[in-house]
Amino acid sequence: MPKNKGKGGKNRKRGKNEADDDKRELVFKEDGQEYAQVLRMLGNGRCEAMCIDGTKRLCHIRGKMHKKVWIAAGDIILVGLRDYQDDKADVILKLMPDEARLLKAYGELPDNTRLNEGIGAGGLDEEMDTANDYIEFEDEDIDKI
């Protein structure tokens, strides 16, 4: 069997996550860019997102972000619009929840935008609360049965 002469495996190539804790500068949209909220993930590096201008677009996740920045339904993203295709866009940046809150406070995002509530996970809490409500009977009602 040949000798293993490598310098480490998969975890060495990944590196350390020291940059995750650092705060980054807030990025505002420029010409040809728009904020959007992810509706659902489609696979193959694509997602469906509702842009702030009211258009539903098919978004392509860049190779730089692919498998490094995880995007889920409900996340706020910055997309670059295409000049030649209005129904498609490219994901430029995923906004962290605190950045999205700041943008909403600055008025960049509309007030009706729901933050930190994924389409798949949102709305289930209300249904769970109603499922745990019990019907209480008094002694008189039990005697009638």
Curated annotation (Swiss-Prot):
According to its UniProt entry, the function of this protein is described as: Seems to be required for maximal rate of protein biosynthesis. Enhances ribosome dissociation into subunits and stabilizes the binding of the initiator Met-tRNA(I) to 40 S ribosomal subunits.
Give the protein family: Belongs to the eIF-1A family.
Q: Where is the composition biased (Basic and acidic residues)?
A: 16-25
Q: Which SUPFAM superfamilies match?
A: Nucleic acid-binding proteins (SSF50249)
Parts of the chain that traverse the membrane: none
What keywords is this UniProt entry annotated with?
A: Initiation factor, Protein biosynthesis
Q: Where is the S1-like domain?
A: 22-96
SMART domains, A to Z: eIF1a
Taxonomy of origin reads: Eukaryota, Viridiplantae, Streptophyta, Embryophyta, Tracheophyta
What is the protein name for this chain? Eukaryotic translation initiation factor 1A
Residues of the region (Disordered) are: 1-25
Q: Select a single GO molecular function from the record's annotations and give it.
A: RNA binding
* HAMAP family referenced in this protein's UniProt entry, alphabetically: aIF_1A
Basic residues: compositionally biased ranges: 1-15
Species this chain originates from: Onobrychis viciifolia (Common sainfoin)
